[in-house]
From Swiss-Prot:
EC number: 3.5.4.16
Keywords: GTP-binding, Hydrolase, Metal-binding, Nucleotide-binding, One-carbon metabolism, Zinc
Binding site for Zn(2+): 86, 89, 158
Record's keyword annotation contains Hydrolase: yes
Record-level GO BP terms: one-carbon metabolic process; tetrahydrobiopterin biosynthetic process; tetrahydrofolate biosynthetic process
Family membership: Belongs to the GTP cyclohydrolase I family.
Protein name stated in the entry: GTP cyclohydrolase 1
Pfam families, alphabetized: GTP_cyclohydroI
UniProt GO molecular function: GTP binding; GTP cyclohydrolase I activity; zinc ion binding
Amino acid sequence: MAIDVKAIEEHIRGILIALGDNPEREGLKDTPKRVAKMYEEVFKGMCYSNDEIAEMFNITFEDDLCINDNENDMVFMKEIEIFSHCEHHLALMYNMKVAIAYIPKGKIIGLSKMARIADMVGRRLQLQERIGSDIAEILQKITGSEDVAVIIEGEHGCMTTRGIKKSGTKTITTTLRGKFNTDPIISNKLMMLYTK
């Protein structure tokens, strides 16, 4: 799906008028174009389904991987910084840090790909909970592992700048699949790494 930049420009111009401002004045003349260009960038992830993102970043390594028999070895990455926009208010979700873990099943994904997946999934109108589910689903497709965990911490503009206005409030969500949801030893290991 392509983003309709021209339609965004027209609607932003309409919003400026609805707000009681003049879209022809010097400071606003190019605003619809700028906003449309910004939306094209910050909502890039909306152009791709989870399957397409999985295909885009489906580069794995198998030859160099030593597989242990216990199948409890874990790949863990944290502090992946992303942003997103809440689908309810279009408010910014910011200071978001994503942690991703998985137990390899014969192949591993490049570390930069994990960060790129998190970034691309964030570039949609989202819920924090869905960001975690989308990342987990994509990682499962690429690695073939059912054992995936995603922990996300972030601040929501809809909580900090409007309504209740509680700045500094952080939301933490977890998405646990496979052994991360059923094996207490694996789950404890994950939380130990996350809080370290």
